[in-house]
From Swiss-Prot:
Reactions it catalyzes: DNA(n) + a 2'-deoxyribonucleoside 5'-triphosphate = DNA(n+1) + diphosphate
Gene of this entry: cdc1
A GO cellular component entry from the record: nucleus
Record GO biological process: cell division; DNA strand elongation involved in DNA replication; DNA strand elongation involved in mitotic DNA replication; DNA synthesis involved in UV-damage excision repair; mitotic DNA replication lagging strand elongation; mitotic DNA replication leading strand elongation; nuclear DNA replication
Localization (cell): Nucleus
Family note: Belongs to the DNA polymerase delta/II small subunit family.
Coiled-coil residue windows: none
Highest taxon of source: Eukaryota
Keyword annotations: Cell cycle, Cell division, DNA replication, DNA-directed DNA polymerase, Mitosis, Nucleotidyltransferase, Nucleus, Transferase
Main localisation: nucleus
EC top class, as a word: transferase
UniProt-recorded Gene Ontology molecular function terms: DNA binding; DNA-directed DNA polymerase activity
Name recorded for this polypeptide: DNA polymerase subunit delta-2
Self-association state and partner proteins as the record states: Heterodimer with subunits of 125 kDa and 50 kDa. Interacts with cdc27, however the function of this complex is not known.
Length: 462
């Protein structure tokens, strides 16, 4: 018998949806950097004034001095030999290729030495930096920060310290209630990876049965305590080109690319049908929040737009009731908590600059920087906003979810009385992991689905 359960109220508080009438691409991307600098400058100025009260602040990077340390607020720009260049892509391939590969932007040799080229830029100009301090501090292109230092004989700025906006206080303090006898959970999953072969994995079937309450309970855990499932993108596997008899004899690299229109021979509807069936089954007993990822049929640039109802032939009947489609990234008001959720592109791109950093470290950095995706639009595509950078954080989340990560992890960040739970959600197709968050305490545990078993892990409260 399928379990039907009451839900936790969920509202998308900051819907980053772009209507067709709003979308114009004639403007330059410089505007988004200026908007970002304008929004974050007051916060950083306040933080830096407290950190360096006896140091002189200069209004422009071009005014830095050589005889004494001073500090300025600017946007960092990072140059590496392996970083993709869209102009080179267009010149060499006459097309634009999506950057979803895991290849890093920084070579191991450069990462070990810290010998990375940086520049600092504001409204008035740009100055080059020397030393490895910025790379050691985790700085990437697009981060707005205050830097303390002086100009050397070569006219480069020598950085001796940095200051970020930092984690600021919640406008509404988070409340937790550990006295509740019956815990209520939300479940988070990412990277279902439904594929072109049309064969659903046993793990996906187990997940459906578990969420519907038709799979034997795991230990003392009851699926009825799960009130909502959040799918953090990549429901579909990466597209694989389907070779046909006409193209099989064409040597690799010689096949003519179709530049206009859509090549219908390369489309396989099976993954979409599988996703539709999955949602139709799960939504009959539990509320679902569905976010697109880089492999799903949504816009390529951030913020990715919600999946179109036309893709969901069967499950669209649940839209407006138990099925909620959201943008990527998105802000959710979930019960008494404020949730920031992403499909993981922002964190995966940061790890390409700093391969040795974990997903949780990169997530914490975005909080310190007050920006969800600082590498946009340089190496992570986004819409060319003009008047406002919509990825600047105006609030701090209580819960920060990031999907499609290499492994599961969670960390509680405490700063000035704020408690923020960070959760990196791994790809389900590779790990079989379903993450559960107790909405009374924000403690985290996982359930792992395997072909022959379902295993509940020890609750994690760190």
């Amino acid at each position: 018998m399928v379990e039907v359960r009451h839900s936790i109220p969920c509202e998308e508080t900051k819907r980053l949806e772009l209507s067709l009438s709003q979308q114009t691409y004639s403007q330059q991307y410089a505007s988004i950097y200026f908007a970002r600098l304008t929004a974050l400058r007051p916060r950083i100025t306040e933080a830096a004034s407290k950190k360096w009260p006896d140091k002189q602040r200069l209004e422009r990077v071009l005014d830095v001095k050589s005889d004494e340390d001073c500090w300025v607020v600017a946007t960092a720009y990072m140059t590496t030999a392996l970083k993709p260049n869209v102009m080179n892509d267009v010149t060499q391939l006459h097309t634009i290729v999506t950057t979803t590969e895991e290849s890093p932007y920084v070579s191991p040799e450069d990462a070990a030495s810290g010998d990375i080229e940086y520049a600092l830029e504001d409204d008035y100009g740009r100055i080059d930096c020397s030393g490895s301090f910025l790379y050691d501090a985790g700085v990437v292109t697009g981060v707005v920060l205050a830097v303390l230092g002086h100009e050397d004989e070569q006219g480069r700025f020598v950085v001796v310290d940095v200051c970020f906006p930092g984690i600021f206080s919640h406008s509404i303090p988070m409340t937790t209630d550990e006295s509740q006898a019956q815990p209520e959970y939300i479940a988070a999953v990412s990277g279902l990876g439904l594929s072109n072969d049309g064969i659903e994995g046993i793990q996906v079937h187990q997940l459906v049965d578990f969420l519907r309450g038709t799979l034997p309970h795991v230990s003392s855990f009851s699926p009825s305590s799960i009130k909502r499932l959040i799918i953090l993108g990549n429901c579909l596997a990466p597209s694989i080109e389907i070779a046909d008899s006409a193209s099989a004899s064409v040597p690799i690299g010689k096949k003519k690319v179709k530049r206009y229109g859509y090549d219908t021979s390369a489309y396989n509807p099976n993954p979409t049908f599988q996703l539709d069936n999955f949602l139709d089954q799960v939504c009959s007993s539990i509320d679902v929040t569905l976010m697109p990822g880089p492999y799903d049929y949504s816009s390529t640039i951030l913020p990715q737009q919600p999946l179109h109802p036309a893709l969901l032939t069967k499950s669209k009947v649940w839209l407006g009731s138990s099925l909620q489609t959201v943008t990527n990234p998105t802000w959710l008001s979930l019960g008494n908590h404020f949730v920031l959720a992403t499909s993981g592109q922002n964190i995966n791109d940061l790890r390409k600059y700093h391969p040795k950093k974990s997903s949780l470290q990169c997530m914490e950095n975005t909080l310190l920087w007050n920006h969800i995706t600082p590498t946009s639009p340089d190496t992570l595509w986004c819409y060319p906003f003009t008047d406002k950078d919509t990825f600047v954080m105006e609030e701090m989340p209580d819960l920060y979810l990031c999907g499609n990560q290499p492994k599961f992890g969670c960390k509680t960040v405490i700063n000035e009385g704020n408690r923020i739970q960070l959760v990196s959600v791994p790809e389900f197709r590779k790990t079989g992991v379903l993450v559960l968050i107790n909405m009374h305490t924000l403690n985290v545990e996982i359930i792992q689905f395997r072909p022959m078993s379902v295993k509940a892990e020890t609750p994690i409260t760190s």
